[in-house]
Amino acid sequence: MFLNLLDAPRRLLALVALGCVALLAFGLYLQHVVGLEPCPMCIVQRYALVLVAIVAGLTAITSNKKGLITGSGVLLLLAGFGAFVAARQSFLQWYPPEVASCGRDFYGMIETFPLQRAIPMIFKGSGDCAKVDWTFLGGSIANWSFVCFAVIGLTALTLIARLARQR
């Protein structure tokens, strides 16, 4: 089935956008129904997922090959960024900092500090980022987020390679 979707890149990109919307909806369910509060790194991953959904959706409506390749390239970069943040959070969960502090929340960091100071603070993580509140099949939300971003990145890379070979 996946190989059939590769022959229809616009359909595959629409499926990626729809999958991202479903993941975002599940994140909101975990936050507002289950009661899990997202940490700063979770929020950055959500923003990356929103951008992936927008780029995948816009690229899906593109009809020319150059636009599909360019959109898939941007998708690859965004998925790589999301995977990096998820991998960093997974690392913090596996090897929590010795001094776990709650730290500031995401918006507090952005509002209080200049951007060049706030961004490193976000990636440093806090006690909240190292905490595992929910698991599925032994993986935390950050672990599954990494898997999703990796699949999106591999899909974009495969699309680029396939489209570049077509005449």
UniProtKB/Swiss-Prot annotation:
InterPro entries noted in UniProt: DiS_bond_form_DsbB/BdbC, Disulphide_bond_form_DsbB, DsbB, DsbB-like_sf
Protein keywords: Cell inner membrane, Cell membrane, Chaperone, Disulfide bond, Electron transport, Membrane, Oxidoreductase, Redox-active center, Transmembrane, Transmembrane helix, Transport
Domain of life: Bacteria
Cytoplasmic side: 1-12, 64-69, 163-167
Described function: Required for disulfide bond formation in some periplasmic proteins. Acts by oxidizing the DsbA protein.
GO cellular component, as recorded: plasma membrane
Pfam families, per database record: DsbB
Transmembrane intervals: 13-29, 48-63, 70-87, 144-162
Protein name per UniProt: Disulfide bond formation protein B
Periplasmic side: 30-47, 88-143
Disulfide partners: C39-C42, C102-C129
Subcellular location: Cell inner membrane
Organism ancestry: Bacteria, Pseudomonadati, Pseudomonadota, Betaproteobacteria, Burkholderiales
Molecular function terms from GO: electron transfer activity; protein-disulfide reductase activity
Gene: dsbB
Cross-referenced Gene3D superfamilies: DsbB-like (1.20.1550.10)
Keyword rRNA-binding tagged: no
Biological process, per Gene Ontology: protein folding
Organism (species): Polaromonas naphthalenivorans (strain CJ2)
Bilayer topology: Multi-pass membrane protein
Record-stated family: Belongs to the DsbB family.
